[in-house]
Swiss-Prot record:
Name of the protein this chain belongs to: Basic phospholipase A2 vurtoxin
Signal peptide start-end: 1-16
Subcellular location: Secreted
Disulfide bonds: 42-131, 44-60, 59-111, 65-138, 66-104, 73-97, 91-102
Active site: 63, 105
CDD domains: PLA2c (cd00125)
Tissue: Expressed by the venom gland.
Family: Belongs to the phospholipase A2 family. Group II subfamily. D49 sub-subfamily.
PROSITE patterns with a match to the protein in the record: PA2_ASP, PA2_HIS
GO cellular component: a single term: extracellular region
Entry GO MF terms: acetylcholine receptor inhibitor activity; calcium ion binding; calcium-dependent phospholipase A2 activity; phospholipid binding; toxin activity
Length: 138
């Protein structure tokens, strides 16, 4: 519970669905979303280019693509609601944009959990300048 409180305090002031996404990541992986995923590999965090470094980084690449398929939505600003049912993330009833953003975040959080065994601390604070290749297509 203390970890949830610390993450919530760290995320105060973060706009939109980033708060919900961070909570999903914490709940699914047990990892602090800010320190474990914000700078991971070539795609986790702001922007992205090159080839994903591993399965976790690919989760971020796919998440970026998912957001890219929402041109009429504001994924980093629009808030949504979700809950858990039998341990699974269930996106709440909201607007079409809110639901699609939630589904993108849900898929990424589940992807992170499924790839916890291959999470590589070498990529935790990976420098952007090492991500040189042209980005893959979504």
């Amino acid at each position: 519970m203390r970890t949830l409180w610390i993450v919530a305090v760290c995320l105060i002031g973060v706009e939109g669905s980033l708060l919900e996404f961070g909570m999903m990541i914490l709940e699914e992986t047990g990892k602090n979303p800010l320190t474990s995923y914000s700078f991971y590999g070539c795609y986790c965090g702001v922007g992205g280019k090159g080839t994903p470094k591993d399965a976790t980084d690919r989760c971020c690449f796919v998440h970026d693509c998912c957001y890219g398929n929402l041109p009429d939505c504001n994924p980093k600003i629009d808030r949504y609601k979700y809950h858990r049912k039998n341990g699974a993330i269930v996106c709440g009833k909201g607007t079409s944009c809110e639901n699609r953003i939630c589904e993108c975040d849900r898929a990424a959080a589940i992807c992170f959990r499924k790839n916890l065994k291959t999470y590589n601390h070498i990529y935790k604070y990976y420098p952007d300048f090492l991500c040189k290749k042209e980005s893959e297509k979504c």
